[in-house]
């Protein structure tokens, strides 16, 4: 079994390589290369001669279409473990002409837009070096298939303008640019020091192959190096590892020789006894010919500070005299990284990175300020913390970025390059490699739903930096201050002079003091009135001793949560208790951005494809920020898709950030409303109206009342497994519509109880979006905890506990959940002045809890009796219940929590789950079940059985990888069938008359031909209809049923005929399709032939892999651009894609703008656009077309 590595030339994504395979020139070139290799025409005649086996004895393997088949070559006994084979001798003139004929023109040889401009060989080097550097990994899997590289470069000529780079980097012709791999094992990762923006960072996103990008191979040596790589390809795993790098042995002047297998030696001697095998150069030559140019290190010891989100990294460097030229000199054993588990986050670290160039080692150590807290939040959950100056657009739209590479490389030679790779810190070229994910070595199974296994969130989004290279975030000690982050639109970070910066800070502090005085005067007469835009938050809070109340409709005064102010910021807000909506939020860190880098990639993706629009957006952001009173300059919102000032209307209202899906940023600050289901954890925005009241007390602290303002500060509580397992009674919370109390209230006209319950419901703080203790599926709870546990940072945050809003008999205050830990009940204020208040508050809460629990224990028997009375009695009898009895029932109606694991339902036994359930029973008794379900009170989190009052929750397990695979409603059906089967059977249901609707005009529907069946069905529901409605007792009969088979055939044929008729009637004859078995092949072939017309394909792949709120807009817009192409089959495929990707959460306003720009720019880049204005039907397609 051979190990392989895949080689690509150019800067396109690997999954688009085959798009060029149908080009005649590429096939011609590949045939020429294949013939030259087979005929051994241009194999050098020096010591590196390679004598291949006869073709008949070669172990053949499949080669990609248009590729070159690699020949197995036996290694010599004298081969050494060096990386660089000797350069080829000068070839005969005829062979050079042949090679030149098969090459692209000189403009194409300028290679991809991501030439590593500083990765040059030593000027005195006799010939360019071919560095084949592979970082040693375990279980290395290197895939080699040389896939028509000439045409691959040739096809990228129009997209890459690299003349300036090519002129300044003549020695870079043989440089290899390594890229990120998807998995730790087999990762071939490296980068050149201070390398320019690289497109290869996005190359491994879609597939799991480990691919290497060659940035323009020298014309004279191209085929020679192909043979070298083919030679490496034929080695066994251990031999190649020993050949490429001496992993297990210490560095030696001449490493030990490899002993090839005796069997291969005999074959070699019998076939070509006089032809020596290639002998790579000894390591001594490696030390004289530096593969990577080493960036000059400052001659004085300098400590610089780098801001990576909330992590401070100090880099101390010493003068270096010894270049790092080989990976053997700097093995992975010399780097001591902090190895974090998956449940650990490094918060506000000060990490000292010492790079001692004399012994070529680096150490990571954490000082006393390091604060590591255990939580379920990972700053790297989506591998989104990548700061990579190597990335560029794979389509090569930005010629400016390529031209700027020279300037950046010349001017920034002293900068420290910070790259994120997926290996644990091998330093090949004087760079600091820091793993943004603590990656696969620490948790190799990247199967977590929050962590895409293919790293598309970083690698496929044409990452961050377009126009700059080698710039890094160098900040002062106040790294939390957003005013000091000169973050440009292209993520180039300026190095700030320390002394200058101190002067600026002093000036800013003076300005801040003046502003603070002015704003305090304004706020003396103002308070913030919370007005909800959506009934989803129907509470009107007021403060009490515990911070919450249940009666008031308008707060006497409000304040901004302390999370909106940061005492460590250089420019704190004017007051820690107030928010002036005429000013923007000063501190970006007041909101949690740790999980918001995914959409940053979306911004950069749009910017990469919209270079012109990019500049406009940048100017807009700068203008908005320069107009602020706080003098925040050049701040582009790094972790949000919106302009932070876009939603502020002076002194009128200011909207709070949307509460978005976990692992996405607070994506919009504009005053917009978005309707979404509570399960998606997206709420509509709340507007803050500034109203002046001379009687309001501005000094009264108010607990934050709108959860959207402090979205990060919620502590979502997850139910305890022991409680579930032991059937511990857990509160379902006071969703009044979910409890029996509402049932009683609906039948009894008791104003006092109505008021209490209404107030209780009004004070339910975002229960529609919070994960209540008993009402969440495991998936949602896990991801939300990931979002919220971020907020344990030492900032002034209020921590809102998961209150159940239960009405107490004595004081109608909110009480927290039964199963909350005591540590979660206090307010998380970091101020030293609040320590005493925290302890007092904690003691009070503990006392309240004890009193409440004792009361509930006493009332439990009576409550059970009342519930039984409620179930068995009629409505008229409830008038006999007293108010006290109703109050005992209303706040908490317990009942056993039935968490249904569908695996146990279907495959369990009687001891575990009471016996198996037939799936057909849900169909046979569906009318009876629906009749019973009419009496059910339900929420989005759970349903309640009307017969036994059990709380029914669908439990996620290994058999349920998807959140909504089994709903709570379906679990309740199984509950009724298992525990209340007699009641289900005895339920009398009136038969419904099936109303037949004429659907003949709709091409998607077909009428069923079965006897007495008048259903109109689609191909999507055809199988379900046939099996359930006609062959439920014996599903196998549907295969032999003539009417079923006739229906299947007609559905497919009529489906296509009706669609064609629809297109013709709407003058869309270009979209007419034929129904045949080769339809998929036609689509794929035409896509390959028209790849130049589909510049958005890469973007579709990128955006589809970013599981964010805002990706739907990107996908649909890109697909709409593809619809405008001339290709008929491609248009049809685009319709399918649009259909399958049209069900995500609504996008935000700023995304709409960006995507409009994206559409405009991409349409300009498409060569053949048809501006069709006719509507394209959004129709579901058969499964065979959706592949």
Swiss-Prot record:
Compositionally biased intervals (Polar residues): 38-57, 443-455
Region (Disordered): 38-127, 189-215, 248-287, 358-415, 443-490, 536-689, 752-840, 1079-1187
Composition bias type Acidic residues, residue spans: 815-832
Biased composition (Low complexity): 71-84, 104-124, 190-215, 248-274, 458-490, 543-570, 585-653, 662-689, 752-790, 797-809, 1079-1149, 1156-1174
Cross-referenced PANTHER family: NUCLEAR PORE COMPLEX PROTEIN NUP1
Name recorded for this polypeptide: Putative uncharacterized protein DDB_G0291812
Organismal lineage: Eukaryota, Amoebozoa, Evosea, Eumycetozoa, Dictyostelia
